[in-house]
Amino acid sequence: MKKSLLITIFAAVSLLPVHAQQPDSVITEILSASVITEGNITYKVDRTTHFFSAAEVKAARDGRELVATIPNLLIDKQSNTLATLAGKKILILINGIKSTDTDLQLIPASKIKKVDFYDVPPVRYMDMADVVLNVVTSRLDTGWNGSVYTRVGQMYSHGDVALSRVSGNNKLTVNLGGHFNHKRKVWDEETGEFSYRLGGDEYKYEYSQKQREWGNQYSGGVAWLNGKPGDYMLQISADYSFFNNKMSRDRYIDFALNGLKDTRSGVASNDVTTMKPTVDVYFEKTLSETSTLMADVTATSYSNDQNAFTSETDAFEDLLDLRSRKNSVIGELVWSYAKENRTFNAGYRGAFGFLRSDLSGSGVTNVRTGRQRLYGEYSSRHGSFSYRVSLGAENNMKAGDDGFSRFAFSPTVLLSYRLNKRNMLRLRLDSETSMPDIQQMSGNRILIMENFYRRGNAEVHNSTGYQSRLIYSYNIPRKLIVQTDAHYNRTAGFLYDAFVQDGDAWYLETRNAHRFSEAGMNMIVTYIPWKWLRLGVDVSADRQTIKETSSGEAFSDWFFPVYLNASAVWGNWSLSCRQTFGGKMLDGLYRKGLEKVSYLSLTYGWKNWQFGAQCLFPFYDDKYSNETVSFAPVRHVTQTNLRTKNREFGFTISWFFQRGKENHSAKSLENSDVDSGVFRF
């Protein structure tokens, strides 16, 4: 029994999928990589570990509500998902295995022992998310667990059902979901201006347009798990997704050629249907008291049908009729070792994709890509000083005459020093690569307006980013959490949309910039003045710079995003408010306004039921503006009002149940392919 206990705890440290079932005192003793403990939070070199009080567990309906009490986390009432204040990408792990919000909801709050919050993801997950949450549970109950969520609103409606059954060493989970974006009478509005020169002529293109999007999404999945804690774990899972998204746009144009004015009109539509089946096989074996081996294979298939149409007065009609089929396989093998205050992980991941694209009028294009990665990571502690060192060696390739093969290292160094019980200082240095999307490497094009198109570029290659960050943390338990940092990030070969003149037309074409950089500061504060009130703010100041070529002109600008969240609880009632403010962020050759989040949400809980009412953008309209940088050869300015969100009301009902007696928890997919190959309209 002692051997099994040590194995499960060691594996939890390494984020490998073994069940943590031990008393907190044993965990605290074994996890000697801890550098500072203050109240309910234990600080480590790359994460904070959160433990929960009996009152917090009692107040939470399910596991997700409990996890959302961690500083910098919340449940976004608009999307009904776990989120950070700034909306960073989150990867949820349950006992080390990639999981979903739904998986977390199916776990009773009383079964969560602790949560590791990685603000610096381990090397294995570095390219998957900004934040990693590893939820460590005790054994789940044998029996049934289920949840139902529905939302009915003016802009969209949503529903999902999840059910799980645990019996002996087996667990079966089934889920179904549907999302419906309504075709409303309210349209989003945009005004804009294009100014450019072409062939000695001067063009000015002013327009006002209205646009609306609608569609439906369906998903379902089944997963079977069989395993013995401390010995082996096998999971076979399959899921299926169907998406149909439509767009319609009407444009009214004042056109001028060398000062001669004309009035025109234009229409555009886009209809995309995607089917995506996925199958995953996961196996894990405990080799000894200190080592574990894991293998995972994921197969995904995308089937896309895309029909896009654009037309303007006095211009030819442009029709995009695209049929694409993409198949991919991702395989991973990981070995982990952990003993006392030392941990080591080593692994290999290979991702291989094949896309067959049939574009009407252009024939068939075959694209084959591959991404192979070897990585290792070591961490340890010496007194008040802790460190984590990792290295990934990666090769990105695209086959064919216009293909490429690029090799890159992605090292990470993380150092931490304990100043005292409430203060901690860390230094992060790392590098990573990003692969272009399939359609960024495609020559397919779509008409934007007369003499203006968008297209990919077969010659683009992967980009490499370098980050440096000095992080300071301060904690008064269950009262005030502050994290602030100063950072400098630089990306070589940055992927962006360039303005390219080709013949008698302009193209918005994917290219690699010489460099993109940002330097600045960020501060995240969570303040709990009273038990019933929680306030959160995430604010940044960044100086962003882009330089297209080594000898070209650079453009710099400041970006000041602010994210606010407030929540209050009185008995069975809860009120939450979320607001986003910000200036313009630099996106390639555009200064783009930050699309905002704003809502008020009121909920009432009764037994296993929860009833809610929401209003999106109750105080102001969702407006933002975009404009090209000063040296861009084309001037493009837009003002957008997303009227479909303004004062949008929705009502929610959710229900959950948990019945049974002791057993263990569930698993979900480990790897995934999210690049469908659909053309960006």
Where are these regions (language model features)?
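Outer-membrane beta-barrel signature, preferentially recognizing the C-terminal barrel domain
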Residues: 423, 433-483, 490-491, 508-519, ...
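Outer-membrane beta-barrel translocator/receptor signature
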Residues: 126-133, 141-190, 215-218
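N-terminal periplasmic accessory domains that precede
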Residues: 33, 63-66, 80-83, 102, ...
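Face-selective signature of the C-terminal outer-membrane beta-barrel domain
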Residues: 217-245, 267-411, 418, 422, ...
